[in-house]
Swiss-Prot record:
Modifications made to the protein after synthesis: Methylated by PrmB.
Protein name: Large ribosomal subunit protein uL3
Organism of this sequence: Pseudomonas savastanoi pv. phaseolicola (strain 1448A / Race 6) (Pseudomonas syringae pv. phaseolicola (strain 1448A / Race 6))
A Pfam entry, by short name: Ribosomal_L3
UniProt lineage: Bacteria, Pseudomonadati, Pseudomonadota, Gammaproteobacteria, Pseudomonadales
Oligomeric form and interacting partners: Part of the 50S ribosomal subunit. Forms a cluster with proteins L14 and L19.
Protein family according to the UniProt entry: Belongs to the universal ribosomal protein uL3 family.
One Gene Ontology MF term: structural constituent of ribosome
Gene Ontology biological process: translation
SUPFAM superfamilies, per the entry: Translation proteins
PROSITE patterns, per database record: RIBOSOMAL_L3
Amino acid sequence: MTIGVVGRKCGMTRIFTEEGVSIPVTVIEIEPNRVTQFKTEETDGYRAVQVTVGERRASRVTAAQAGHFAKANVAAGRTVMEFRLEEGDYQAGDQINAEIFAAGQLVDVTGQSKGKGFQGTIKRWNFRGQDNTHGNSVSHRVPGSIGQCQTPGRVFKGKKMSGHMGAERVTVQSLELVRVDAERNLLLVKGAVPGATGGNLVVRPAAKARG
């Protein structure tokens, strides 16, 4: 099974095992994932299911989006995601919930990392600082040399320098699913996941566990 679900990060807490061991967990609320389209090899060239979650005001929905949602007979959502399918069939209007997962399963969680703005090389790339004394002036946090001389006469692409940090799509792999609360549609994942509280998360079965 490769299909995943879209959820919302609720925050972190901890639970205790019967032996009294504390386990840090992230709580992910899996809102009903409403199927907006089922793609097949005959019509689209591949098998996939498209879902939407949450709500969006009608004034924020374009005419094309409104027509797409109306065709599927589902309410407009705040985001649309697509998952490839190896097996199984879905109909527009179906709902996918937390029940597709089981406790003890390994999952990959994808989200947008917290934006940190413009940062220097020490915070962004873990560079070490230069000497605080011994003749060093106004160069305590500078990166140092960024290249050569007349040859090649340029800075190579990919050079680690200051710049915008965070606000990127990040995936944390092979996290243990400690508990599944199907009644409240909650997933408790061991450890931390990307993004701020309230952000969208995509939870999939772990790719490495599938082999």
